């Protein structure tokens, strides 16, 4: 099996070594498999970034799939769900930059941050932050 290129590079595995173990675990816990497009994962990650969590692309996949399963009614409003983020978005600065500057080919960012250019002075940065959030 040949893996396709993806923004979520750490899960870009064509023939995983532990595929049998993964299938056993899915069956044991009545799990399901779903996929996310590049646009879905980028927008889910960008949406999470707005909460203050700098989301990695792999967590973006999990969040995009969560949204799909909720919208299809597979996951109900009363259900309790945990999404584990195993990496910090700061390890994926290129991904974050591309998401928030609309630079991912074929993907329109719906949750991009507004860039603010500031002089490299503490007071200017502090004042800009104070204007954007309640302190």
Label the predicted regions.
Residues 38-93:
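Claisen-condensing/thiolase-fold acyl-transfer catalytic domains that form or cleave C-C bonds
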Residues 95-97:
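Short amphipathic alpha-helical segments
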Residues 1-55, 99-135:
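Active-site/ligand-binding loops adjacent to catalytic centers
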């Amino acid at each position: 099996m040949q893996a396709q290129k993806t923004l979520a590079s750490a899960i870009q595995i064509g023939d995983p070594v532990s595929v049998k173990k993964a299938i056993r675990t899915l069956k044991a816990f009545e799990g399901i498999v779903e996929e996310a497009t590049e646009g879905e994962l980028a927008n889910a990650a960008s949406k999470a970034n707005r909460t203050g969590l700098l989301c990695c692309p792999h967590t973006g996949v999990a969040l995009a799939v969560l949204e799909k399963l909720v919208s299809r009614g597979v996951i109900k409003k009363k259900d309790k769900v945990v999404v584990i983020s195993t990496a910090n978005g700061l390890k994926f600065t290129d991904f974050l930059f591309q998401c928030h500057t609309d630079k991912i080919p074929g993907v329109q960012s719906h949750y991009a941050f507004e860039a603010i250019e500031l002089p490299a002075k503490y007071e200017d940065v502090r004042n800009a932050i104070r204007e954007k959030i309640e302190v």
